[in-house]
Amino acid sequence: MAFLKSEGLHQFGELSDGGYGANAGVTWMPSTTGNVGLRFDFSYTVYGSESTPTCLTTPCWIEGDLVTRNNIFQVGIGPEWTMSNGPIQPYLYATAGPSSFFTTLEARHCGRRVYDDCSETNPDTYQSDWGLAWNAGGGLRYHFSEFFGLDLSYTYQHHGVRDYLVEGDLALNDDGTITIDNLRHSRANSLVFQIGLNINVPQWG
């Protein structure tokens, strides 16, 4: 499991503020002595969000926020080459699979006291664009014990030309309607830095 920080490239980078999210994956090594395995990745990135104060009831007895989030979901599979079998393991990998750019809207209400919890409704999706993406990157694992290690990586994500929204593109109108003011259409590629925990599961037999 890893935390990720992304920076968009070209027009996508100029329109968005960068993103943050999480990545989970597993690499299957068919041989205990081999250096080539099969990598599976699942990643989720939020590349923009905004909150709009609103009344959650009529009359306005309960106030809250409408939260807009711009997201990327991606699944990838491909080869991984580990260059060393010692405690320090540099590696290279490439994956390909489906990815989606989608924008959601949900209502959020928080209590007035500091220790009150916040509640959110299930998000509604107002725009989505599925397509094929591929990643190419490399990293370094440092195993500080037999089972656990630190994983650092840097990746180029290629999504190609996509339709997507950025902050301010989804309009919340005074009459209660929701419209898309500006649907963006451009290349939407990114550079991604990840830091996380690596768990090593030994092979028996």
Label each residue range with its predicted role.
Residues 1-7, 42-48, 96-104, 156-160, ...:
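Transmembrane beta-strands of outer-membrane beta-barrel pores
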Residues 1-31, 103, 185-205:
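Short glycine/proline- and aromatic-enriched beta-strand/turn motifs that initiate or cap beta-hairpins
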Residues 7-14, 60-67, 118-126, 178-185:
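Extracellular loop and loop/strand-boundary signature of outer-membrane beta-barrel proteins
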Residues 7-13, 49-59, 102-117, 163-170:
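Outer-membrane beta-barrel translocator domains and adjoining extracellular loop/strand segments
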Residues 14-20, 67-74, 124-133, 185-189:
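Short sequence motifs at beta-strands and strand-loop junctions characteristic
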Residues 22-28, 42-44, 75-81, 94-98, ...:
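Residues on the lipid-exposed face of transmembrane beta-strands in outer-membrane beta-barrel proteins
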Residues 29-33, 84-88, 143-145, 202-204:
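Outer-membrane beta-barrel channels and translocator barrels
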Residues 136, 144-205:
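Predominantly the C-terminal beta-signal and adjacent terminal strand-loop region
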